[in-house]
Amino acid sequence: MTRAERKREHINHALSTGQNRETGLDDITFVHVSLPNLALEKVDISTKIGGLTSSSPIFINAMTGGGGQLTYEINRSLARAARKAGMPLAVGSQMSALKDPSERCSYEIVRKENPDGLIFANLGSEADAEQAKMAVDMIQADALQIHLNVIQEIVMPEGDRSFTGALGRIERIAAEAGVPVFVKEVGFGMSRESARQLFDAGAAAVDAGGYGGTNFSKIENMRREKALQFFNTWGISTAASLAEIHSLSADQSIIASGGLQSALDVAKSIALGASGAGMAGTFLKALTSKGEEGLFDEMTALLQELKMIMTALGCQSVSQLQKAPLVIKGDTHHWLSERGIDTSRFSRR
């Protein structure tokens, strides 16, 4: 099977498997504010993500590319909607275009349709610094995502089996790429120990990529003769991942992703420490079911609903929302307690 064929299979399986809604965000409850003293029109949702200023904390996370005409059309529609909504956009892994130049157009269309927007390039941790620079140049990217997908590769029948040297490559890429480097998980979450290593290696931001959204173990298991079912429930939830990473330092740039489906999910993620929130499966489903205009409507509704939530909490800015008090309960509270993370610092601030 070619890379392009595998990319198309991934899209179809992602739509059919959906999201399992085990992000841990249902364990998060905001402390209600009866006197917010704020008008909705005064709310400012601009933010800084890894040193980049964005008018929107929500962005379209990496989905696809390199799968022929289908992925070209998806990326074209995503780029158009992102331009109209003022949202950043990440492309899927560009390794396929580095190996097969005929696939470059499925990525280059993003910059062509969105010449002034924030665009993130994307490669896996197997890439070297020279490939990273080529990926950035391909789409004149403002930042580069490096994705960590060990479990997906292990389950993938034709996937990688050696993961040595990844941190060293990331460190070199961060030093030489010429743009901020964001390192992201792909649905299996991230511990504070892993995040610390990545920040120390020069990552401008880490993306939690928590468990609870699109499940790449399930997707790859659908392609196996003998499924590795034990990996289907493997990982750290989005909520727990965010709290873990935030426990390192309040000054680090954190991105939330992994099953985010609503403005409330985004608001909770920001209050857990994120400065930006990536959504992929939700936007892909909107595009395939409602078309490009329907996707744009969904995006603008999310941004407006986020402003409403911030108004209710009395938070005029994203930085204020990051300090909004919340209570953590259930499995997420249990996980964090066992990991030695004091949840009262969220509820008593």
From Swiss-Prot:
Entry annotated with the keyword Magnesium: yes
Chemical reaction(s) catalysed: isopentenyl diphosphate = dimethylallyl diphosphate
An annotated GO BP: isoprenoid biosynthetic process
Location relative to the cell: Cytoplasm
Binding annotation for FMN: 62-64, 93, 122, 184, 214, 258-259, 280-281
Needed cofactors: FMN; NADPH; Mg(2+)
Gene3D superfamilies: Aldolase class I (3.20.20.70)
Amino acids binding substrate: 6-7, 152
Entry-linked Pfam families: FMN_dh
Enzyme class: isomerase
SUPFAM superfamilies documented for this protein: FMN-linked oxidoreductases (SSF51395)
Keyword Flavoprotein in record: yes
EC annotation from Swiss-Prot or TrEMBL: 5.3.3.2
Gene Ontology molecular function: any one: FMN binding
Binding sites annotated in the UniProt record for Mg(2+): 153
One GO location term (cellular component): cytoplasm
Function: Involved in the biosynthesis of isoprenoids. Catalyzes the 1,3-allylic rearrangement of the homoallylic substrate isopentenyl (IPP) to its allylic isomer, dimethylallyl diphosphate (DMAPP).
Oligomer and partners: Homooctamer. Dimer of tetramers.
Xref: HAMAP family: Idi_2
Family, similarity comment: Belongs to the IPP isomerase type 2 family.
Name listed for the protein in its UniProt record: Isopentenyl-diphosphate delta-isomerase
Protein's organism: Bacillus velezensis (strain DSM 23117 / BGSC 10A6 / LMG 26770 / FZB42)
